[in-house]
Amino acid sequence: KYIHSFPINKEEVSLAILSNKINLKKIINIVHKEIKKKMNQFLKKNRNKKIVVLDIPLLLENKINKKEDVLVYVQSKNSEILKRLSKRKNFNKKLFKIFKNIQLPLDYKRKKSRFIIKNNFTKKTIIKKIDYILDTIS
């Protein structure tokens, strides 16, 4: 009903999500099955690596992390996130709020994480913190 092209057009997906809450659940289910499959392929391919970094949206929400994973929470000011996202083509504030609402509380994510990086959007401080994390877990 909403998707009319392949590869899938982001605007069509956005319209489907905004039109019906059930569509969001269906889309998340489809996308995260694929994410889990790709993640497992990636981990298998890199199983001999000392450290593997994954950046997966809704990792905790979809329970696709393992107990022994080292979680790193990247903390950013909401105003900065919104400012950066609003610069993107086709940014939709309603969609942003919908996705924000399906996420676990930030305090929960912080508590589950072994490390926290305060993202002030400067490369130097982030690299310094990443180096510290790598030294600590190596």
Model segments located where?
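ATP-dependent small-molecule kinase phosphotransfer cores
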Residues: K1-N48
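Short beta->alpha linker loops
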Residues: I8, I30-V31, S76, N101-L104, ...
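A general structural signal for well-ordered alpha-helical segments in protein cores
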Residues: K10-E11, L24, K36, N78-L82, ...
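Amphipathic alpha-helical segments that mediate coupling or scaffolding at interfaces
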Residues: A16, I30, R84-L85, F99
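Residue-level signature of catalytic and energy-coupling elements of molecular machines
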Residues: I27, V53, I117
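Small-molecule kinase domains that catalyze NTP-dependent phosphoryl transfer to phosphate-bearing small molecules
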Residues: I35-M39, R47, K66-K67, K87-T136
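ATP-dependent NMP and nucleoside kinases share a basic, alpha-helical "lid"
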Residues: K38-N46, I51-R88
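A short, gly/pro- and small-residue-rich
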Residues: L71-Y73, D135-S138
